[in-house]
Amino acid sequence: MISVSGYRLRPEDIEKLNVSQTQRDIANRMLAMPSGYRYGSISELLFELRFREHTVKSARELINSGAKFATFSKTYGNEEFWRVTPEGALELKYRAPASKAIRNIFESGPSYAFECATAIVIIFYMALLKTIGDQTFDRNYQRIILYDWHYERLPIYTDKGNDYLPGDCLYFKNPEFDPSRPQWRGENAILLENNLYAAHGLGILSGETIIEKLNGLRKPHAQTSAYLLSQVTRVDIPALIQMIR
């Protein structure tokens, strides 16, 4: 269900929107969901649709960039734009344009290595950059630290449920992971389309294949399979719009 200023949108309203086919497909999926998506204006809804389309594209681009998976202790990045902290965070350098720094991760992927939650935040930043443009992004994001689920001025939240949409982050949990490789206790992944995910360190895979790979990374004699959690992590678009100058 989609509500705009208290008005519940119908399928014919979605058909009238001046959007791409990908965005229209996302809107129709939102319309069919039992949970409500509420916006103060049509422009907020259009922002969300653009952001989700850019999230899907950016997730694919990051997987294909050559950026590596690494634990925090082995994180590295292009030192022209980023300083690696002792904790393994990538901190935007003073006076470095945030737009160029984020784009560089996608353009010079082999110069970077980071873990999967950091990858999700990077994808969200890139999607936002594509949505609002370089100047607005640089004005609003003069300080960025890429570290796990740390983020600046990006209202990310997690809810229980199964109302998954393209551009959402989902989590595959591996309860009996190998203790010698704790980085494989689970995998964050962006939903690209029905049962197709972008998972940093694994690739673009079906849900079944992600589970199969995680099961291969369990401790000896493990009995419990990895599984997809009934939760979704996404950006609160109306709140984000209020934050951007």
From Swiss-Prot:
| EC number assigned by the record | 2.3.2.13
Q: List the disulfide bonds.
A: none
Q: Does the keyword Transferase apply?
A: yes
Q: Which GO terms describe its molecular function?
A: protein-glutamine gamma-glutamyltransferase activity
- Lineage top rank: taxon: Bacteria
User: Catalysed reaction per UniProt?
Assistant: L-glutaminyl-[protein] + L-lysyl-[protein] = [protein]-L-lysyl-N(6)-5-L-glutamyl-[protein] + NH4(+)
Provide this UniProt record's keywords sorted from A to Z: Acyltransferase, Sporulation, Transferase
- Biological process (GO) annotations? sporulation resulting in formation of a cellular spore
InterPro entries documented for this protein: Gln_gamma-glutamylTfrase_bac
Catalytic class of the enzyme: transferase
The record's annotation in HAMAP family points to: Tgl
Q: Record's family? A: Belongs to the bacillus TGase family.
What does this protein do, in the record's words? Probably plays a role in the assembly of the spore coat proteins by catalyzing epsilon-(gamma-glutamyl)lysine cross-links.
Q: What is this protein called?
A: Protein-glutamine gamma-glutamyltransferase
UniProt organism field: Bacillus licheniformis (strain ATCC 14580 / DSM 13 / JCM 2505 / CCUG 7422 / NBRC 12200 / NCIMB 9375 / NCTC 10341 / NRRL NRS-1264 / Gibson 46)
